[in-house]
Amino acid sequence: MTNIRKTHPLLKIINHALIDLPAPSNISAWWNFGSLLGMCLLIQILTGLFLAMHYTSDTMTAFSSVTHICRDVNYGWLIRYLHANGASMFFICLYMHVGRGIYYGSYTYLETWNIGIILLFAVMATAFMGYVLPWGQMSFWGATVITNLLSAIPYIGTTLVEWIWGGFSVDKATLTRFFAFHFILPFIITALVMIHLLFLHETGSNNPSGIPSDSDKIPFHPYYTTKDALGFFILFLLLLLLVLFSPDLLGDPDNYTPANPLSTPPHIKPEWYFLFAYAILRSIPNKLGGVLALVMSILVLAIIPFLHTSKQRSMTFRPISQALFWILVADLLTLTWIGGQPVEHPFITIGQVASILYFSIILILMPLASLIENKILKW
């Protein structure tokens, strides 16, 4: 008799995705981040669900409800910090996953790549709205500053901002709707993840060499289930280390002060994982220009597949492109640092140089380097 996992309508889907899936035999640890992101999403949904049971989305009680979770709810502090730091882990995995995609040319799977970009935007929107919910100083002012950016849109900007706010400033209506969106978006993200995987399984995984691996496949289980399990263990260990030893390491002390519309914090800045984009936004003195640069900093990923001029898919055997890639990584770290600094000399200039370099590497230098490498290899 045929195994039930191969015949049952539901188990068959799981079998084709996680058990009998033919996978390349040489995929490295860089291919672990997809499954790690799945784990992060699950942790966020579960901890978020338990937090939502005790949280109140009202300006008068939001801050104290978070305090109540940490002080009075059984293991509430653990759930809250797992959720907050889980978001940081989520973004670390996200950026590594995207970086892997750029390095190994995975972006040539256009549908998978584009769904991935939509996923990135959705996760960023979710994280931003989640940061507003504790209703601390940075929550309030972060929401005010970021939503205000939409007022740069010509003609409809101001109306749009007031429509999002549900009034003339960030207030009760804003907090309530942000909570509603923050709750629903992870489920939309889960649906998008399924589409992402659906498109990936149409083509199969890429591999470090960038060469088709149809002649050399191994079953996903037990090889990659074991490898993923090790990844889960390491990531969860790192998350627990962060949560149990230094839960506020990545947070902002200002968010322990209740939101006060009459007092502006000295430095308004988002969570660390948005600082690179924030630095790009601030590096342009014009409001609309800054907003466009901010959006383009992520949207530029959609252009990358069309700028692939190399005869090879992966960067494994392309030293010039490799050097540019790691300069890009260093540049993003520089932008992250600048985003957290005050707007003064020399940080303004460093931010502007780093922003120009960011777009130059992706849009100009990498395609040029690929052409040079083709010439070197006489292709």
Curated annotation (Swiss-Prot):
A ubiquinone binds at H201. It comes from the Eukaryota. The chain crosses the membrane at residues 33-53, 77-98, 113-133, 178-198, 226-246, 288-308, 320-340, 347-367. One of its GO terms (cellular component) is mitochondrial inner membrane. GO terms for biological process: mitochondrial electron transport, ubiquinol to cytochrome c. Keywords: Electron transport, Heme, Iron, Membrane, Metal-binding, Mitochondrion, Mitochondrion inner membrane, Respiratory chain, Transmembrane, Transmembrane helix, Transport, Ubiquinone. Its cofactor is heme b. GO terms for molecular function: metal ion binding; ubiquinol-cytochrome-c reductase activity. The keyword Membrane applies. Heme b b562 binds at H83, H182. Coiled coil: none annotated. It holds the Pfam family Cytochrome_B. It is found in: Mitochondrion inner membrane. It is a multi-pass membrane protein. Binds 2 heme b groups non-covalently. Its main location: mitochondrion. Heme b b566 binds at H97, H196. Belongs to the cytochrome b family. Heme 1 (or BL or b562) is low-potential and absorbs at about 562 nm, and heme 2 (or BH or b566) is high-potential and absorbs at about 566 nm. Component of the ubiquinol-cytochrome c reductase complex (complex III or cytochrome b-c1 complex) that is part of the mitochondrial respiratory chain. The b-c1 complex mediates electron transfer from ubiquinol to cytochrome c. Contributes to the generation of a proton gradient across the mitochondrial membrane that is then used for ATP synthesis. The cytochrome bc1 complex contains 11 subunits: 3 respiratory subunits (MT-CYB, CYC1 and UQCRFS1), 2 core proteins (UQCRC1 and UQCRC2) and 6 low-molecular weight proteins (UQCRH/QCR6, UQCRB/QCR7, UQCRQ/QCR8, UQCR10/QCR9, UQCR11/QCR10 and a cleavage product of UQCRFS1). This cytochrome bc1 complex then forms a dimer. This is Cytochrome b. The gene is MT-CYB.
